[in-house]
């Protein structure tokens, strides 16, 4: 029996040895040794391929295809049936980094589970379903006009740092593990925050060293040194004349030499091509690739036509050395080994996470809890909130965001199994017969479209003829034909087919009809799509694009009475993008608020759910409505159509609870007059509607605090393209409508006099602070205690700057003492003499309270020797 056992053991050892033909395939060796061995076996062309974010397979060595690009901004993006948490700007309002950690631990569970399930079903590593997630975005939200500020954790470097570190630790897993759970990515390095429409060409050269080291770099430094983030993404723009992805000051002297970063630098997508196409600092792709690799950019992201495929030619022409490529390749390959991607799933613990964990009950509860904690109560006149359910006979829910589930998902989002809208949340608290709903108006447009689709006809059928092919180029057999007599709105979200027999991926469609105009007029086509989209009228192309997001387009078109118009839409699903298409056309008529007011004659209380959406603000978007440009905003006021409707409701004597959904600050000065209560709900994720209803009806006491300044008007803002911090954020501006750190509660907290263990310390000492807090009200609630520091007589420094915070919960009538420990770095500021961040001797003011507003703060003073 023992002989048989020995033979079996030797047999399996033999199999293992045969399977491990090369040293790099041996999981018992260190990652560096394995990477060196693999590099020694690669050709120069193969090395270049492995430095592209879509790394092709190398079959002769058993190297599988690998994609570096996935997104997990607030859940696994571009995937169905995942948990969609609130947008990061909303999470920042919770001031709860412990909850943020739990959320991103859940997100990394879902990524791993979906990834391995996909492989088990025979799939391959693909874009948007991989082990490298380009999250978090830790750029400072310095200006509310920036469309991507919603992806960040606000305007303050310390808050950004606390939240960003929690994100990375949740995504990457414990440092004690042999294999990383995922690779997280700190982006966009550095000094990056719009304008979106100019990001490929702008040269930012007005950032003084103080702003650089006190504002723009701290979060990146912390994620590198404290969270061991494994990837850093360099940005599109130029900083002081050099593109960020070719900027040796940023990538070598600061990132690697000062901070000791030893992992992967990845370019933003297409940023290296910008060297020669937009920035004009390189003559062509060959020289751009050479500049980037020498400057320290290891991995190139691009849609196609990678500049890094020119690296072998660059070596042959002596522009770079092969050792330069090997240096970057070592970092990239060690990443793949550390993720366990080169090893069998059987020895990678993270591969055991079951797919049943995706959007499970625990994750849904986390999404709901974060949505609740993210809500900020900005105004509550005469304590109109919370509403008493039993006393409500009828309530109106009005507004363009009341039933918009897609708005709640924000951007860089996945698709949940179920989304609870605000209307649904309110109905769940009352009953359908007590709730009246009307959209009221659109987000921006002050006109409504009277659809003409019913007036169209094709092949003796009303509306559009829809023809489908299971190819992307309208070729092959037709697999389905339908007739659509209503506005087109189709999606594959939730695994829905466009038509029976049409695949979820790799299909194309044509929608055709004829329209005879009844009069001379200007009509408008309204459309949006993810994928390839083209609209033709009488064979003339009116709009044509490829896009990975569904964004609204409005195309005016003049028609003549009696003339026939052949309308054709060509659509194709592309890449692994989810398929979406929306289309309508007709005449526009002015909104008549009087009709709505008549419908509300017996209703006194209105919940208006408005604001913005990810279709208006976001990343480099072809949006050109008044007040919006290229994903950014040109003013920060509430769109006039919503403002006018709120005025009409006020003039009709209605009590108004305004729920503002946006990823950025809105100047709500007029709304403080027209509205009785204002709730800032951000883009609250899949359970956002229930969280909003919980707050409105008092089932949850709001505790969120603003992570950004809400200005009074656009007139208070400096030039968008000026990156100086002067006049920006609470640190250099103090005339806000609603200040950073502000947020009301249904209870009242009394903050007592703080005690410090010392009033004089040395530069390397800690300072301990004790602050008594009492809940003076009738409700259990949570409060966020905030600590700010200012260097006395620092005339060009910040008014104050956040250095610590704690979120506490207290029952009504209860008290506690909150303990803070300020480490020495809390007193670091930029020193012009040394050119470094350092602690200098002198007096320091410490402010403490529940917002950054002067009247909400108390002060004490200490001295540092």
Map each language-model feature to its residues.
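Glycoside hydrolase catalytic-domain context in secreted enzymes
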Residues: 20-830, 838-854, 863
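Bacterial Sec-dependent N-terminal signal peptides
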Residues: 1-22, 346
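Short, structured beta-strand-loop surface elements
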Residues: 858
């Amino acid at each position: 029996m023992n002989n048989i056992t020995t033979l079996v053991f030797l047999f399996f050892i033999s199999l293992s040895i045969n399977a491990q033909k090369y040293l790099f395939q041996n999981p018992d060796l260190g990652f560096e040794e394995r990477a060196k061995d693999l590099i020694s076996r690669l050709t120069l062309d193969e090395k270049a391929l492995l430095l592209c974010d879509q790394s092709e397979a190398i079959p002769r060595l058993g190297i599988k295809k690998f994609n570096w690009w996935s997104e997990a901004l607030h859940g696994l993006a571009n995937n169905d049936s995942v948990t969609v948490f609130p947008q990061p700007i909303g999470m920042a309002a919770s001031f709860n980094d412990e909850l943020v950690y739990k959320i991103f631990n859940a997100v990394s569970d879902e990524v791993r589970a979906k990834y391995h399930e996909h492989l088990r079903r025979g799939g391959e590593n693909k874009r948007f379903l991989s082990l490298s997630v380009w999250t978090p975005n830790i750029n400072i939200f310095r200006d509310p006009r920036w469309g991507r500020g919603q992806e960040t954790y606000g305007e303050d470097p310390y808050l950004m740092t606390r939240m960003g570190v929690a994100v990375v630790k949740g995504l990457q897993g414990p440092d004690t593990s042999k294999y990383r759970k995922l690779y997280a990515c700190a982006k966009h390095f550095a000094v990056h925050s719009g304008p979106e429409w100019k990001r490929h060409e702008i040269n930012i050269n007005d950032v003084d060293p103080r702003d650089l080291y006190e504002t723009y770099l701290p979060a990146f430094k912390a994620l590198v040194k404290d969270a061991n983030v494994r990837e850093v993404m360099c940005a599109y723009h130029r900083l002081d004349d050099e593109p960020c992805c070719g900027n040796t000051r940023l990538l070598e002297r600061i990132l690697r030499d000062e901070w000791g970063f030893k992992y992967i630098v990845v370019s933003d997508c297409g940023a290296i091509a910008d060297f020669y196409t937009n920035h004009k600092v390189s003559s062509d792709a060959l020289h751009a690739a050479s500049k980037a690799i020498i400057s320290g950019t290891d991995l190139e992201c691009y849609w196609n036509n990678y500049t890094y495929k020119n690296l072998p030619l660059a070596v042959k022409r002596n522009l770079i050395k092969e050792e330069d490529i090997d240096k970057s390749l070592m970092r990239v390959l060690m990443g793949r080994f550390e993720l366990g991607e080169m090893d069998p799933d059987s020895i990678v613990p993270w591969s055991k996470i079951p797919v049943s964990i995706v959007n499970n009950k625990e994750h849904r509860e986390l999404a709901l809890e974060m949505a609740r904690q993210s809500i900020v109560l900005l105004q509550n006149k005469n304590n109109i909130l919370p509403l008493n359910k039993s006393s409500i006979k009828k309530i109106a829910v009005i507004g363009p965001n009341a039933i918009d589930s897609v708005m709640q998902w924000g951007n860089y989002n996945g698709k949940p199994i179920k989304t609870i809208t605000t209307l649904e949340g309110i109905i769940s608290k009352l009953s359908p017969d007590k709730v009246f709903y009307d959209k009221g108006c659109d987000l921006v447009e002050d006109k409504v479209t009277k659809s003409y689709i019913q007036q169209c006809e094709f092949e003796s059928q009303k509306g559009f003829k829809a023809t489908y092919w299971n190819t992307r180029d309208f070729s092959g057999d037709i697999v389905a034909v339908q007739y659509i007599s209503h506005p087109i709105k189709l999606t594959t979200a939730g695994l829905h087919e466009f038509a029976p027999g049409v695949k979820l991926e790799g299909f194309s469609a044509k929608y055709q009809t004829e329209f005879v105009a009844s009069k001379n007029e200007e009509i408008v086509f309204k459309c949006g799509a993810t994928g390839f989209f083209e609209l033709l009228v009488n064979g003339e192309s009116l709009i044509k694009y490829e896009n990975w997001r569904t964004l609204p387009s409005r195309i005016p078109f003049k028609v003549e009475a009696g003339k026939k118009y052949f309308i054709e839409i060509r659509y194709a699903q592309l890449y692994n993008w989810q398929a979406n298409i929306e289309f309508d056309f007709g005449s526009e008529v002015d909104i008549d608020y009087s009709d709505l007011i008549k419908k509300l004659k017996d209703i006194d209380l209105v919940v208006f759910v408005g604001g913005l959406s990810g279709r208006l603000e976001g990343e480099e978007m072809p949006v050109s409505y008044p007040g919006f440009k290229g994903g950014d905003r040109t003013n920060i006021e509430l769109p006039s159509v919503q403002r006018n409707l709120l005025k009409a409701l006020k003039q009709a004597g209605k009590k108004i609870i305004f729920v503002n959904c946006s990823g950025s600050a809105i100047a709500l000065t007029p709304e403080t007059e027209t509205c009785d209560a204002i709730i800032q709900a951000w883009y609250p994720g899949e359970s956002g509607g229930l969280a909003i209803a919980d707050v409105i009806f008092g089932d949850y006491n709001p505790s969120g605090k603003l992570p950004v300044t809400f200005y009074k008007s656009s007139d208070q803002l400096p030039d968008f393209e000026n990156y100086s911090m002067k006049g920006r954020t609470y640190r250099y501006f103090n005339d806000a409508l609603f200040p950073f750190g502000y947020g009301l509660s249904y209870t009242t907290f009394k903050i007592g006099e703080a005690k410090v263990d010392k009033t004089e310390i040395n530069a390397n000492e800690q300072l301990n602070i004790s602050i008594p807090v009492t809940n003076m009200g009738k409700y259990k609630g949570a409060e966020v205690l905030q600590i700010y520091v200012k260097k006395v007589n620092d005339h060009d420094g910040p008014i104050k700057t956040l250095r610590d915070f704690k979120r506490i919960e207290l029952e009504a009538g209860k008290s506690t003492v909150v303990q803070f420990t300020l480490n020495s770095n809390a007193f670091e500021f930029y020193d012009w003499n040394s050119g470094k961040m350092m602690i200098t001797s002198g007096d320091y003011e410490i402010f403490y309270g529940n917002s950054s507003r002067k009247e909400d703060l108390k002060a004490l003073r200490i001295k540092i020797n």
